[in-house]
Amino acid sequence: NLEFQEVIDRLYPKEYECSQKIRELIQSQYGHTVTEEEVAYLALHIKRIRME
């Protein structure tokens, strides 16, 4: 059984990679922890924006 974030990573690898970079930025600049689930949701939002 695949985890939600694994499914998103497989379906949208470019968006998932981008969201991981954003997570690194948020964590380094603001000291806020971003979960894997939040990274996956961010990837979905990035995919939606790219489709517009």
Model segments located where?
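A cross-family "folded-core" feature that marks the main globular domain of proteins
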Residues: 1-52
